[in-house]
């Protein structure tokens, strides 16, 4: 919306270089664009038109004449607002939102995320509390997350998408928050509320592909435009979607500007970039003969590499204090290395290897875990090759994979004990944490995108509510202690911030390690993944610590454990302390 020559109206622009003609149509002209032909801006491929009297709330699309003379009607790729699906029109909108998160924004870039606590609660917005709007969520979600001590939320889905079952991973409106939950200003209200509660906001961002809907980006002006012309490179084999043409400068600009837009316009603190591996490899999920190599005969996609580098460098330059996080499932070198050192430039990377191995370990019966001991220790071989997030995400608790507590062996008590011990190990392990909703209170059912978390498990009327509240209390205490202990986050990317104490006790199912803060202050984490109590278990400790005090014990009665705790300080003798290790539990100790 703008004023031109003293007249209020809306200026429409669209990139359609292959079009023979473009017209604006909408409810203001009964969807007949004959009266609103757009003019070409020459070799740029952009068409534009100022329409007087068109303002907030007007529905519109572009009527495009293809090179062959046929017509197609398309939504605006850069629309700031869209209709509620299944309707597909774009909506003229102008924000009037007045932000109240100035204190958060001013402090956002004060300390590098790698040297700060970073604990993420992953939220599927439509199902966290089904039926709530952005503004209604703002009345509940910030308080809940802040109470549990998470530093950030990661929200999905955010950008507009036609198929709800895609969970937002098949985007058509890259610049529009999904209208299912409200307007763009309503979404800003939610972000604002989270910031005012002291919670950072990450969003899932999907520049890897887009759906084939005939009103959206696919063959937008009658020719491949946002997608490569080579059909083998264009078609994404896993999802039936189309990949972006990262070698085309206009497409790169569309995506880079989009990343900046979310962080500047909506105060988003970070982007978790989905499916990075599928962008980096030309042969991703393709058989021999189904892909074409790059100009050097290789399988990597240099255009995608250049795009990711440009996106990260531009975002960090334009919006200091934001973080980008790669969901990258291969061993690509330099995902979190700086772009000036020829890395991709991400701030963090999901540690899919740690997730796969550690979940594999805890799913075994304790008697068999000794044969899989390396699955819990191998992560430290490469822990400092990238800057990692340890993700227990939505992908791990759906499609037959079971909820986290249900992955664990044994009876209900043992499953909960395993769950608690695992989270204690995870929060102490080098790397940042991410936990999907519902796992913080050990719901036993898989995540349902329709029904969301099973909140009734926490109700007074439910006979086992205490079991689930105990797990939630543990997550709260894990986050509280984590944020208070610099040893657990200050040197996450520094190998000298970690040392094994016991890494080879496969027969015992025991792991013990030290974490060190920048000033050298240690924290000792000990995990016993056996149902057997270990009496007088010897652990070597630094000589300069006169006594150790239990800071957290996942076996405490308040969490639902057997309450085998040690309230008194433990003094070392000859460089060792002797502990009684509770069954299926993790214990943290700090200098007394």
UniProtKB/Swiss-Prot annotation:
What is the top-level taxon of the source organism? Bacteria
The task this protein performs is described as: Catalyzes the formation of the alpha-1,6-glucosidic linkages in glycogen by scission of a 1,4-alpha-linked oligosaccharide from growing alpha-1,4-glucan chains and the subsequent attachment of the oligosaccharide to the alpha-1,6 position.
Catalysed reactions listed for this entry: Transfers a segment of a (1->4)-alpha-D-glucan chain to a primary hydroxy group in a similar glucan chain
For the biological process aspect of GO, one term held by this record is:
glycogen biosynthetic process
Report the pathway entry: Glycan biosynthesis; glycogen biosynthesis
The secretion signal range is none
- Identify the InterPro entries for this entry: A-amylase/branching_C (IPR006048), Branching_enzy (IPR037439), GlgB (IPR006407), GlgB_N_E_set_prok (IPR044143), Glyco_hydro_13_cat_dom (IPR006047), Glyco_hydro_13_N (IPR004193), Glyco_hydro_b (IPR013780), Glycoside_hydrolase_SF (IPR017853)
PANTHER family on file: 1,4-ALPHA-GLUCAN-BRANCHING ENZYME
GO CC, alphabetical: cytosol
Species whose genome carries this gene: Streptomyces avermitilis (strain ATCC 31267 / DSM 46492 / JCM 5070 / NBRC 14893 / NCIMB 12804 / NRRL 8165 / MA-4680)
**Keywords on record:** Carbohydrate metabolism, Glycogen biosynthesis, Glycogen metabolism, Glycosyltransferase, Transferase
The main enzyme category here is transferase
**Description of how the protein assembles with itself and partners:** Monomer.
Q: Which Pfam families match?
A: Alpha-amylase, Alpha-amylase_C, CBM_48
> Which family, according to UniProt?
Belongs to the glycosyl hydrolase 13 family. GlgB subfamily.
EC annotation? 2.4.1.18
- What residues form the catalytic site here? 274, 327
One MF term in GO for this entry? 1,4-alpha-glucan branching enzyme activity
Protein name in the entry: 1,4-alpha-glucan branching enzyme GlgB 2
